[in-house]
Each structure stands twice: as C-alpha cells, then as structure tokens.
C-alpha cells in the first residue's frame, strides 16, 4: 500500500505483455508501462476495475477474501447485493440462493436491499431539504466514484449526499441485532459482503465513506456464484435466518434503480466509469445545474477475475 491507500487491484508481471491496453483504459492515468511491464501508480488508482475488464492476458486480478476466513468467527452473516441474484437464471428462486449461502457456512443472510430501502428515504429527505446549494447532488454509494472525485474532482466533494452506503448501513444494523439476539460479542460475529467490483473490496479495508467499517471482509461475487451453483438443489431448510429486501431495495441493482427507489424524477443515472468521468467533468464546470441528483456507478457488468 503506497500513499496510505489500500488497493484490491493487482498486476501480475509474469502474465503482462506490455500491450498498454490497461494504460489506455484507466480513467485516472494510474498505470504506466516500464521495461515492457505494466506498473500501478497507487496514488491515482481508484479500484474501478476498468483495467481488469480490458486486459486480454489475465494479467490483472482483484483481491478478495477467502471463504475459509469465515471459520474464525462463531457466527457469520452474508450481505448479498441485488446484483448477486441477477447472476442466476430467472427460474432460480431467491430461496434456493439463500439455501446455497447457508450450505457455504453462513448462519444468517441479510439483503443489502433492505438497507437500500431506508437509505432511499434518507436521500429523498436530504434532497427535499437541500436549499441554496450547488447542484446536482451526487450519489455516495460507489467507492470508485468517491475515489474518482477525491483524485480528479475534489471540488465536488461537498455535492456528495452525506448518507451511509447501503452496504455499511446493513452491516451496522445486522451486527447490532445479532449481538442483542444471541449475546455474542462483536468480534465473534463475521459480516461478509458479496462484492460485485474491486472498489468495494478495497473500501472494506480502507473506507472512503466511513471511519470504521462493520464489515469483516468481502467475497467475490463470481466465486460465490460458482460455489452456489455446485451445491444447489435439495430441500430448503426453513429454520435459517433470512432478511429479504423488497422490490424497491432490489431496484438498486439495476440502471436507474436508485433514482426510482428514492422517488427522484429530475435525476440522471450514469453507469460505467468513463461515462461517470464525463458527467463529473460537466458538473465541475457547473453545466448541469438543472439536474437534482446523479446516480453514479463505476461498473456496467459484474463478472470479474479474482486472485482465487
């Protein structure tokens, strides 16, 4: 970790061909090629994963935690995002996915979508009471976008809505609830986010939005998806604890879902780090004053190579 910031993106020198595809893809110019190999300029990297998606030689991976690390806790909670459910065929029931997570060793499942519902209300209330400040306001939920603002557009930090991201809100609530219900101590409870992108992995280890995270680690969505597929089937156990989100919370996993859940009509949804960059540039030039809110997410698809 250089410059005081942890990164989940790792460059594998042995597989790098020096083709500069990653250099061209990086929105913050955080990669350079020296002596035929790509190198990361860590102070500029925002962990958006754009380099990872573009590399054709599998020379870039995203580091996540291993499922085996859950064994150090007495009680483990999975935080699945809406995007996990979207990986499965439409005929796959949520109950079947929950059962798969239980069989992987999780004692409880708490949908991030539940927290998204409450955060949507907070965003709507903040927007309603926001008077006289510069617009548009900007979504706080994507760590890569927050890092991009810090690195390239620091003047926009004051326009980021000051609410907890749903993942962190879910972790705080469910850990406290389990402590009260079971009598277990905080250090005996593991909270694991099933992460769809590298920036969320990095954010757990060194957060850009909270001082002390309640999330113990992240597990790659692609790895968990594969493991669930292998163990799916059989009888679903009814005695396991599941807190499921509604369609409003689940809508956060789709384009424009955050705007819809918060009831924002005069908003703009932007997905994909390059499009987000372009919009932030326009906002910094004060050219989007007529827009109330920008939903901004760095990724457009979710299957990422990992270090597994």
Feature-to-residue mapping (PLM):
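Short acidic, glycine/serine/threonine-rich loops at helix termini
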Residues: 89-91, 121-124, 149-153, 202-208, ...
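Immediate flanking context of iron-sulfur cluster ligation sites
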Residues: 186-189, 283-298
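Phosphate/adenylate-binding glycine loop and adjacent helical scaffold
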Residues: 197
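A conserved mid-domain beta-alpha-beta active-site/ligand-binding segment of alpha/beta enzyme cores
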Residues: 228-275
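A short, acidic, amphipathic alpha-helical segment used as a generic capping/interface helix at domain edges
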Residues: 272-288
């Amino acid at each position: 970790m250089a410059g005081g910031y942890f990164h989940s993106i790792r460059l594998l020198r042995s597989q790098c061909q020096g083709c500069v595809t990653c250099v061209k893809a990086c929105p913050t110019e955080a990669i350079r090629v020296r002596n035929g190999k790509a190198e990361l300029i860590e102070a500029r990297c925002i962990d958006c994963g754009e380099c990872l998606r573009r590399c054709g030689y599998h020379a870039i991976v995203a580091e996540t935690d291993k499922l085996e690390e859950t064994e150090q806790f007495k009680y483990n909670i999975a935080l699945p995002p809406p995007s996990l459910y979207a990986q499965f065929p439409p005929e796959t029931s949520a109950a079947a996915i929950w059962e798969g997570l239980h069989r992987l060793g999780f004692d409880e499942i708490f949908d991030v979508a539940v927290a998204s519902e409450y955060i949507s209300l907070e965003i709507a209330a903040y927007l309603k009471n926001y008077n006289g400040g510069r617009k548009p306001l900007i979504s706080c939920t994507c760590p890569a976008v927050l890092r991009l603002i810090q690195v390239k557009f620091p003047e926009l930090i004051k326009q980021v809505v000051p609410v907890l991201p749903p993942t962190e809100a879910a972790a705080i609530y469910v850990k406290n609830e389990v402590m009260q219900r079971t009598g277990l101590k905080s250090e005996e409870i593991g909270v694991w986010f099933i992460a769809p992108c590298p920036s969320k992995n990095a954010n757990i280890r060194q957060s850009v939005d909270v001082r002390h995270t309640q999330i113990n680690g992240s597990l790659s969505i692609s790895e968990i998806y594969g493991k669930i597929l292998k163990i799916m089937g059989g009888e679903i156990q009814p005695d396991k604890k599941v807190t499921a989100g509604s369609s409003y919370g689940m809508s956060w996993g789709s384009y424009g879902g955050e705007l819809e859940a918060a009831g924002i009509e005069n908003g703009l949804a932007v997905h994909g780090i390059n499009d987000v960059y372009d919009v932030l540039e326009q906002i910094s030039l004060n050219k989007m004053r007529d827009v109330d809110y920008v939903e901004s997410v760095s990724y457009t698809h979710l299957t990422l190579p990992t270090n597994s």
